[in-house]
Amino acid sequence: MTDSEGPSRTVLIAALVLAVGAIGVVLAIAVTRHPPLQPVAIATVPAPHAQDPPCRTLLAAVPQRLGDYQRASIVQPVPAGTAGWRAASASEPVVLRCGLDRPTDFVVGSPIQVVDQVQWFEVRQDDRSTWYTVDRPVYVALTLPPGSGPTPIQQLSELIGHTMPAVPISPTPAG
């Protein structure tokens, strides 16, 4: 082959390698790119202490990620004292509410679970659960979808332990 017959074999191989590499990069970007997270809709519930200093401090410090969940915007109007996270693979969000009233089911003798020095009371609703802190100056609720695993409650327990002092629990008298 002479120079007048076209590009050399080396140039053709280099061009082919570059083209395959460019296609590989485009495919890798397409596979790893996540669609934008949908905003989280949070119903308004009474939260008389949502503007109290402990809630403001907590909400200012919540992380952008809770395990596989990423902080998401909240549909307007945003209820006071709330934050939400979504996972690309999950349809249900993780929702945090701060400044709520004491849960009505939290009575003397209710089972409590401790996660990283924070005491939680669980309320089950269909296939999800809501956990309430019961040993802090304000009640914080964390609603977890099925399959969310322990990471969200562990990370938030650590944060709550650092941002809010512990107080004695105060369940409603039984009966």
PLM segments and residue spans:
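Extracytoplasmic/periplasmic/luminal assembly and interaction segments
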Residues: R56-F106
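A generic structural signal for short, non-catalytic loop/turn and secondary-structure boundary residues
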Residues: P35, S89-S91, D135
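Generic secondary-structure boundary/loop-capping signal
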Residues: P39, R71, T82, Q117-V118, ...
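Extracytosolic low-complexity repeat regions of secreted or lipid-anchored proteins
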Residues: V95-G175
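Hydrophobic membrane-insertion alpha-helices, especially the h-region
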Residues: L12-A30
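C-terminal region of N-terminal signal peptides and the immediate post-cleavage residues
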Residues: S4, G24-A47
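Terminal targeting segments of Actinobacterial cell-envelope proteins
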Residues: M1-S8
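N-terminal leader/targeting helix
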Residues: L37-Y69
